[in-house]
């Protein structure tokens, strides 16, 4: 069956940050990453635009200088000056106005008739692969573009017509690409370093800011482990004043928790006071009821001594009065015992042999319920515990009585004693009472040791007041032990664990 969507706990996906520290850290890193990446991208694009503009300007200046040098060369050729007599392949090397890295060429009918690559050491003819790359393109005076020119790499190139020839210029992009690449590497490194520093600072700042919240949580966890069921317990733990400042969110949580603890502490004190008054009332009422009940029972017995002179209906009525007076007296005695045990009545403790006590109790039960089969699974040697003999005998008797009263004849009841050096409440002595009668209703099982609780109809014959197991639980608690009940698959087991004394520990070592 699928739990209701309003009550079932929703488990967060494994990819989702679970702690507030992780959420804050990832949130800050996400925001800082977006901002730094945006700034880095803008700076790289800005630098790229600036370098491109510089290359465009240099390309225009280079083409202008080539036009000027080409015009002077043609004018010199018409006046038969020494420069004008040089072939174009030589004259191009003498052209001026070019910066290192620039490439110029003069084409005639798509064929390079002169070229020069400028450097710090002067001009030299363009390599053959560069010339082939230039001649492979169609230069029709379009806008500047980027071309890969063989061994020289990427160039931003342009051309213009000059009579029957075409002038070609190219500005190297090697330096510009290096600058942009270096800028990208620097930006990535700075973004990474900034993220590392931001993460470290965020972890420290968030950890410092959340310390009050952790202290508040520690206070709540401490209260959660307190035994609030004790009558004399008070919640003395509070969030310290420094963590209850209402001007911040953590302080609001701490202040609210203190108010909650005050309210719970007051409610517990009120409950304890009510319980104490109720116990005192039960004790007083039990004391007051014992005398009139004894009188009723006594007068009924006294009157029945002359039963031969009484009508049958009167005889029957007196018998019922006497029987119900006994039941009422037993109920009052049990309530009085429970009240005394709840108030922490001092026990008359001594070291006693639990095995001998159980044997006597089983023998009494076998006489009271001969229709049941009684099996003793007891050790041969004595098992020593420290306790009140009368109370422990009543504990065992109540468990055995519960076994035969609430089961049909023929049921097997097994009583066992085991010494445990490990496990729950160890070292301890475990007394178990097992029967193969009907199972106890699972809905009743968790409340089996409460007052006035009876087993399911399949195990109940209608007798009893529902106080026997409550007395068992109180006696066990008074002896610093524990009692549990299990029922299922045609078997019901009651287990009582009592502390093992040093003498028994030495015996079982």
Curated annotation (Swiss-Prot):
Main location: membrane
Gene Ontology molecular function: ATP binding; calcium ion binding; manganese ion binding; phosphorelay sensor kinase activity; protein kinase activity
Post-translational modifications reported in the UniProt record: Autophosphorylated.
Residues recorded as bearing Phosphohistidine in the entry: 287
EC number: 2.7.13.3
Topological type in the membrane: Multi-pass membrane protein
GO CC aspect terms: plasma membrane
Keywords, in A-Z order: ATP-binding, Calcium, Cell membrane, Kinase, Manganese, Membrane, Nucleotide-binding, Phosphoprotein, Transferase, Transmembrane, Transmembrane helix, Two-component regulatory system
GO biological process: phosphorelay signal transduction system
Enzyme kind, highest EC tier: transferase
Transmembrane segments: 24-44, 188-208
Name of this protein: Sensor histidine kinase TrcS
Organism lineage string: Bacteria, Bacillati, Actinomycetota, Actinomycetes, Mycobacteriales
Gene name for this UniProt entry: trcS
